[in-house]
Amino acid sequence: MPEGLNLRLLDVLGAAADALVDELDADACAISRVIGDVLILVTERVQAGSTLQSGQGYLVPDYPQTGEVLETRVPRTLTLDDPDVDAGEAAILRALGYGSLMMLPLEINESTWGLVEVYRMDRRPFTSADVARAVELCKIT
């Protein structure tokens, strides 16, 4: 991919992360590239002085709910109050200081390119309207 196209995509992804946080009353957003079974953070929108970067990628098989989103291409929301939240997903949320998460696939050219994660510090769940808006904001053409 030409360098100019890569920069344009990063600009588009950064703008999408900004819009998701602003429009969904969220506290943070991460957009990661999926390469095989690994998620690599490519852009984030967080509060000043913080990061979602862990220093390494995440292995998708370690997080079954994330894997399900990537495989089925169906968005998923969860909170730390959910009885069926995966222990690995819950541990990451707690470590990052968040209580609610929306995950959705990022599709480019009709294939799953990456994962979008939108976070809230509180445990207030994302609504179906939030999910619908996130899907619209993540359409990359």
Regions picked out by a protein language model, each given a short descriptive name:
Residues 34, 50-94, 102:
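Regulatory sensory and allosteric helical modules in signal-transduction proteins
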Residues 107-112, 121:
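Flexible loop/coil segments at beta-strand boundaries within sensory signal-transduction domains
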Residues 1-19:
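Short regulatory/linker helices and ligand/cofactor-binding micro-motifs at input modules
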Residues 115-125:
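Short beta-strand-to-loop transition segments that serve as allosteric relay/switch motifs
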Residues 18-22, 29-57, 61, 66, ...:
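GAF sensory/regulatory domain recognition
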Residues 108, 126-141:
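Amphipathic alpha-helical "output/dimerization" segments
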Residues 103, 114-115:
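Short glycine-/small-residue motifs
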Residues 99-107:
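A short, aliphatic-rich beta-strand micro-motif
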